[in-house]
Amino acid sequence: MQGAAVWAIPRAARRTGVGLRLRGRTLKNVYTGLVGDIGGTHARLAMVDEEGHIRHPVTFEECNYPSLTDVIATYLEKTLGRKRPERAVLAVAGPVVDGEIQFTNNSWRASEGELFVAFEFESVRLINDFAAQALAAPLLPADTLRRIGPDLRGADLAPLVVMGAGTGFGVAGLARSNRGDVEVAGEGGHGAFAPSDDTEVEILRILSQRFGRTSVERILSGPGLHNLYSALAAIRGVPATLADEAAVTAAAETGDALANETLDRFCAILGSVAGDLALTFGARGGVFISGGLAPRMADRLASGGFRSRFEAKGRMSAFMAEIPTTLIQHPYAALVGAARALKRPAAGVR
């Protein structure tokens, strides 16, 4: 993904309809835009060239910036100088309501209207980050995907679902047809956790004492991984000595028994939730797993209890056995989906 120059039309040229020339084409007709993947911890921004390729991707630590506007301003100044892209699509972590987002896992808020004014975009659109990944899923190269479980082919034009654990737990579906695809954003991570065995019943009891209501995200996320570790420590009657999810993951690599039990249980619960989502969406096109945590557990997902728990749906087990489960390993999947959304007729504020 080497950088390539991206141009925007001076506003005077836009008003007069006069296009500047560039290698035999008018800049007015060159397709350009800004795309972003704004999660709970990191903000990733990139440009999209006239061929739809991702250019100049940069990752920002959100804790170093007071707002999304500051991140975008920093990126554009360093990447384009005084030039500005015409359009923007930003994939954001949380529900977008009337063009506004209050981020679920940090203190930022943003709106299409504010970004439109601040950067003089011709149009700007906010979409859910997992909706962007759902748009990307059918387009991702095979070498950026890893099959988890049987090497199955998803049904053509059947719905698919993308889910994943990071700072939180995201979910979105993609409804497919010959007339095009439509993403369906959701907040499935805030659905209730459903235990599948006696140990998970006890996990639910412990976490409910702490949180009141225990959602999927209280377990299937970075912070949730540590919640799960602490609950299992209480069940086993041993001290929870590891400070956070990174310490749990590191301890598992050195053979710590409780840390390994935690990761195995995490993958099993992820399989159950993936199966529930496949049933909810009728996702015969496949379930795609993304997020910051799963790629670091790829071998454990492939060899552990994920797939068996995915298929363990009683009378629907035969149905589940035909649905492929795939790990997304593309580093910029949400940006690919945002770039796809950028190709649509202008939406959002314009």
Language-model features: where?
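Glycine-rich phosphate-binding loop of actin/hexokinase-like ATP-binding domains
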Residues: R147, D151, A155-V216, A298, ...
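Active-site nucleophile and cofactor-binding loops and adjacent substrate-binding regions
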Residues: E61, N105-N106, R125-A132, D151-G154, ...
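Short beta-strand-loop/turn "lid" adjacent to the catalytic site in phosphate-handling enzymes
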Residues: L80-L126, A131, L135-T144, V162, ...
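ATP-dependent carbohydrate kinase catalytic cores
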Residues: S123-A155, A246-C267, S272
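Short glycine-aspartate micro-motif
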Residues: G33-D37, R87-V89, R125, L160-G164, ...
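Short, acidic Gly/Pro/Ser/Thr-rich loop/turn segments
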Residues: A43, P95-V97, G168-A172, N227, ...
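ATP-binding/phosphotransfer module of carbohydrate and carboxylate kinases, centering on a glycine-rich
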Residues: W7-I9, A13, L22-L80, R84, ...
